[in-house]
Amino acid sequence: PDQITMCVAKNTSLEVLNLLNIFAHKYTFFKLRQPEPQKLNVDLEQNYLLNSGLHDSKILASNMCVLIGVNPRYEGSKLNLKLRSRQLKGNFNVIHLGSLVNLTFYNANITSSTQILKSLIEGNNLFCQGFINSLNPILISSTEIFKRKDSFCLTNMLRLLIKHIDLFSQHSSQSQLNTLNLALNDVGFSNSSNLKTITNLDFKNSTGIYFI
């Protein structure tokens, strides 16, 4: 038979995804695809997880948070409430690299250009002064960065930024990039298998395409 394509998204349950994987391995004409490309290194869970240690006490012990391409007001409302509560207590600076949005609390917004990120890494940005002697700084991004074509380069730049922040900040433990997952099954979907992205060739060769 001709190719049958199943396009699965992140809201697909793990039970259904595992069943479809069994079909794909058993029948060669059965193809699994995802709607969007995602360049994600799943070798280490810390590459795509929100740190389990990012609880209220850690946020209270910090005086700086860097949000990178994430809008926690809509993408993580519980986290946004924690950050807002901490900011209202005072002595808590929030730097937001991304589009100008209303987070419901004060933050210093700078553009999301990679050139700005590069200047932070090189120490040529005025905001670098805030990293000096900062206390337990928190860095948060989202899984949206993995959809960029330059995601591998971008994540490497973020690791360099974290490394340099650790050199000048005061911290009880080594900092890491916290990744906010936008869908309930983001982690399971990312860790289950690396699916190819659906292409025009799939539409041409398939007798049926099913979106789940």
Which role fits each region the language model picked out?
Residues P1-I212:
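Catalytic alpha/large subunits of respiratory electron-transfer oxidoreductases
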